[in-house]
Swiss-Prot record:
Family statement: Belongs to the HypE family.
Gene3D superfamilies: PurM-like C-terminal domain (3.90.650.10), PurM-like, N-terminal domain (3.30.1330.10)
GO biological process, any: protein maturation
Protein name per UniProt: Hydrogenase expression/formation protein HupE
Species: Azotobacter chroococcum mcd 1
Pfam family, one: AIRS
Domain of life: Bacteria
Function: May be involved in the maturation of the NifE hydrogenase.
InterPro entries membership: HypE (IPR011854), PurM-like_C_dom (IPR010918), PurM-like_C_sf (IPR036676), PurM-like_N (IPR016188), PurM-like_N_sf (IPR036921)
Amino acid sequence: MSRLDLKNGSVEMVHGSGGRAMGQLIEELFARALRNQWLDQGNDQAQFELPPGRVVMATDSHVISPLFFPGGDIGSLAVHGTINDVAMAGARPCYLAAGFILEEGFPLADLARIVESMAAAAREAGVPVVTGDTKVVERGKGDGVFITTTGVGVVPPGLYLSGDRARPGDRILLSGSIGDHGVTILSLREGLGFEADIGSDSQALHGLVAAMVEAVPEIRCLRDPTRGGLGNTLNELARQSGVGMQLVERAIPLREPVRAACEFLGLDPLYVANEGKLIAICPAEQAERLLEVMREHPQGREAAIIGTVVADAQCFVQMETLFGGSRMVDWLNGEQLPRMC
């Protein structure tokens, strides 16, 4: 059998048949890019040891369109997204699993580019992809490639973060500017040109999280504001904890190109997706220390205290506007920007 044509070839139904062609796809494309001691064993599962602590598991499916964008692609995004979900528990991400749904006819050159990007992101994060699966669907029944990743990590003993732990008086911190990812994807998808000045913020945040929890283990909760953006995520946390939140608009980091793009498109940046930012809630007396630690890290240089947790049985999130008024930051109704991740 000749080698895969990674320049001009495409995915065929036989690549999902479980036979020789599938083995060739796995060996010459997936295993070569993602190679590590677990994948080299060739098993249908991975066996590994974990350090002491509570085990955390998270899974995330990625259907983003377009597949490639300034600042990343579906491969790196699949790694970053699941690592971040694990890290938001205060955990150290240890291992990843990946499942691919491929559409018949998808160019092998694009698939190789995606898998190599995934491998590079995993290496940079120090979190290997140790097992995986591939399926092929008929032409027209997919959209190129969908990726599901599952991550396993460990929370150090004595640390407990959860979305139901926010208390009145706590401070709300944000690690950086919002809306970059969502505006980048929408601009590229619609051919608007904003992506020339804006790129996705997709990145793995476990290094920032490790620095934060080491310095301030009293952190109540962490959450990454992905789909639905900052507004939806804060409503989720308010509902989980049975509290309200009071935000200050002028304190929320927002880059000028993103602000201008949202204004042009009629979007509220509070609801635009992010892929490399986190929200932290901590006791008021720890907020300045936590802010200092975040700003010392490359991924938190734009960090800010953006609000306060308040007692509110209705769990409303409200915001003091730039003009001194007040507005409700409600749950997002409908889908403002589909297929952002």
